[in-house]
């Protein structure tokens, strides 16, 4: 009997195994019956570009589809965050006192900038009057939240009309919204610019104070009229209704802004079935238009024109061309884009998503693909980002990686390898590459860094209440993306792709939560997955498996595997033989009550008895002589988030 004990001797050599992902037709199920509140905004604002202030009138038709009597309303007043000593200001400065990896843990765009804003640079939103069905209502400010105590409650299944007059001042650009961005040069990036009704759902009201994190809105229709200096050019959510009066590429390609005698021009946008409205304005904007074939959406690219800079023009034209190429792939993987237009607008402070539009600070295609994919994972699905930021940023980052691979014809791991070739002294990257999967490799690297840091918090943490920006960003973006790729390891990549399409079909425009997603995944896969959500999202327990020992008895090789970490998983175990052939041995987890299909039809696979989660070890028996085996490896695809892979591969030399 020959025994190899690997508890103290490990082989660090790794091999990569790329699993191909194919798209399968989607399975359909009954749509969930969950009530949704409904809004219809009609707004008219008058902007003064000299004072950066505007006055607005808002008519809001609010339908209470809930079974509840509403005694209060809550509104977001986001601009009020941009004042010294605001919650956003103090929160940013407090986080900046934490030093992680030698740097202050604050958003570099915010830092302590709010504390230094002058009276003319701050933002504010003030309510002048508020009436419901003609009756004045008392209201109270809570910084970025307006509380309205109703004179008469709103009955279930009823509709009210809310009329509001308000005034606002656009803050100097600090985060997302604002004026006079020093980086982009854009005059106005107008997100979170109007008093916005908070969402009321099956959990009640969500009056979340604004500290620069996430959003949650009510589905509805927006009719927005903007009166602004006639030299300004605009882009935004929805369709421009008065395109014939405006020109500038909205009425026909390459047309100029139509001359008018009045000092202010009126722009009239309408966007239906959305939960927010964004716009941006600048006198130097240039407008590119692309039409998708076969009746698809119109694609707009609106950017700050720089005279005698053809490189800038070329980069923004590539954005337009890339969007045309990418959209069919995006729809095939994630569902149909249902709106009549989408606009990539130069503005903001990085990249920020909105219905039918995004504000991006530059023409980088990674940001372009990421923000556009937010049209699926937030704009069409509308999860509560504050509670489930990983379903927003994580799912979007997952999709971005695939779209980038499709467009660039290279995987994320290939990109990291090219980076290492350019920077051969980057030891950290050199150590990482062997343990990362072919796709979503940067996300896995981010997750492993989070685990190693000791700052990790559960994904169930409210986005505003993470103790560090470092933990929040790596959880929402990296771990959320890893959640989806690792799901493919558990149920099979092809099945996971079906899940994503069914998730879209079943839940778009319905505000799903994490349990809703898991339920869809269980229906499509036939596998129980509540354990996966609870372990990976509700705890910080980690996956760690190893090859403990192997030996031969009467021509049968036995391999003892050991679960070292606290999170159980199904196991793929690949054997490599002297002739170069391979064989997969699969141990489903007993909590799954099922098994994933063979992901590689060209490779022989044997399904073994399920591994009970209570048992730390498992002995695999294979009908091969030990001396015929040259390598044994746990999860050669490296999609399982094993935090210590040095004991996952054993190479045998005979």
Give the location of each predicted region.
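Hydrophobic alpha-helical and helix-loop surface patches within well-folded domains
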Residues: 15, 38-39, 77, 269, ...
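Short, hydrophobic/aromatic-enriched beta-strand segments in well-ordered soluble domains
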Residues: 58-60, 77, 158-172, 222-230, ...
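Hydrophobic helix-coil surface modules that form long, contiguous segments used
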Residues: 197-204, 212-369, 398-401, 410
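A surface-exposed beta-strand-loop module
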Residues: 63, 103-185, 610-627, 637-638
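N-terminal, polar/Ser/Thr-rich
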Residues: 29-55, 529-531
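Solvent-exposed beta-hairpin/edge-strand motifs
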Residues: 74-135, 231-232, 576-589
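Non-catalytic accessory/interaction domains
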Residues: 240-243, 373, 462, 494, ...
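Glycine/proline-rich low-complexity spacer/linker segments in large multi-domain proteins
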Residues: 87-100, 167-222, 638-654
